[in-house]
């Protein structure tokens, strides 16, 4: 009986440590947990996907493409400038003719690598969009890390003077 109680105590400790690490991982990414589509949907997404991609009409406002008033070539230069300012980001390939680049983000503690593809896409009306796709190389759930990469690059673009407009969802 003592062995069973000790094993149950150990199991409880492992569960508590796991839940604490999970909470710290998600909270450490400073994600907008209470924003639409809500905490439950976000938690489920962060635990079960390792990809974050900007998509028109995304239920996650931070994952909607942003439009800019800069010409596409100037905006692509700002994207490269913004990435250069981000810690642990490295541009590994850049194609000026198509305004696309591939960057690798290396995590601080375990040195995990995430791939981020960024494109500046010209739009009718002259307001190019920045679209992104961030993918973890390891694991099934990224705890929102790739969403954080998208948010970090959009924030860095603001810092270098490229001010974007987020597509607004219509209220129905």
What do these predicted regions represent?
Residues 2-10, 19-172:
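Ser/Thr-rich, low-complexity intrinsically disordered terminal regions
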């Amino acid at each position: 009986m003592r062995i069973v109680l000790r094993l149950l105590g150990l199991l409880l400790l492992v569960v508590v440590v796991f839940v604490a690490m999970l909470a710290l991982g998600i909270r450490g990414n400073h994600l907008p947990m209470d924003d639409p589509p809500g905490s439950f949907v976000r938690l489920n997404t962060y635990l079960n996907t390792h990809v974050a991609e900007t998509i028109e009409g995304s239920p996650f406002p931070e994952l909607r493409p942003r439009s800019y008033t800069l010409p596409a070539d100037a905006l692509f230069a700002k994207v490269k400038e913004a990435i250069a300012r981000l810690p642990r980001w490295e541009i590994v390939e850049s194609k000026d003719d198509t305004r696309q680049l591939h960057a690798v983000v290396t995590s601080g503690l375990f040195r995990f690598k995430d791939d981020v593809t960024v494109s500046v896409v010209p739009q009718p009306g002259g307001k190019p969009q920045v679209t992104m796709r961030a993918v973890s190389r390891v694991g099934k759930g990224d705890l929102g890390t790739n969403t954080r990469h998208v948010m970090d690059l959009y924030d860095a673009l603001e810092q270098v003077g490229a001010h974007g407009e987020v597509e607004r969802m219509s209220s129905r």
